[in-house]
Swiss-Prot record:
Coiled coil: none annotated. It comes from Rhizorhabdus wittichii (strain DSM 6014 / CCUG 31198 / JCM 15750 / NBRC 105917 / EY 4224 / RW1). Part of the 30S ribosomal subunit. Contacts proteins S3 and S10. Belongs to the universal ribosomal protein uS14 family. Keywords: Ribonucleoprotein, Ribosomal protein, RNA-binding, rRNA-binding. Binds 16S rRNA, required for the assembly of 30S particles and may also be responsible for determining the conformation of the 16S rRNA at the A site. GO terms for cellular component: cytoplasm; small ribosomal subunit. HAMAP family: Ribosomal_uS14_1. It comes from the Bacteria. GO terms for molecular function: rRNA binding; structural constituent of ribosome. This is Small ribosomal subunit protein uS14. Pfam families: Ribosomal_S14 (PF00253). GO terms for biological process: translation.
């Protein structure tokens, strides 16, 4: 089980990303658009720098829904490999069976 503080920190980051998503996307589009004036792009970059660091989507870490484990994460199931194997063996994940050939 991951430290509760790490899990909570990641949840706070998710909330910040959600709150600033629209503003972040708008400013990023202006800053990356080469057809815009250079000063307008610079202003957008400066405004992007004022947004909190944790509002950047790349700072959010994918974590297991059960344990909060950050590594060996399967996006499709939102679980780490340990929990995926455990729940699949117990038959709690529909459509997942142990491979046999």
């Amino acid at each position: 089980m991951a430290k509760l503080s790490s899990i909570n920190k990641n949840e706070r980051r998710k909330k910040l990303v959600k709150a600033y998503a629209g503003k972040y996307a708008r400013l990023k589009a202006i800053a990356d658009d080469e057809s815009k004036d250079e000063t307008e792009r610079l202003i957008a970059r400066l405004k992007l720098a004022e947004i909190p660091r944790n509002a950047n989507p790349t700072r959010v870490r994918n974590r297991c829904e059960v344990t909060g484990r950050p590594r060996a994460y399967y996006r499709k199931f939102r679980l780490c490999r340990v929990q995926l194997r455990d729940l699949a063996n117990k038959g709690l994940i529909p459509g997942v069976t142990k491979s046999s050939w």
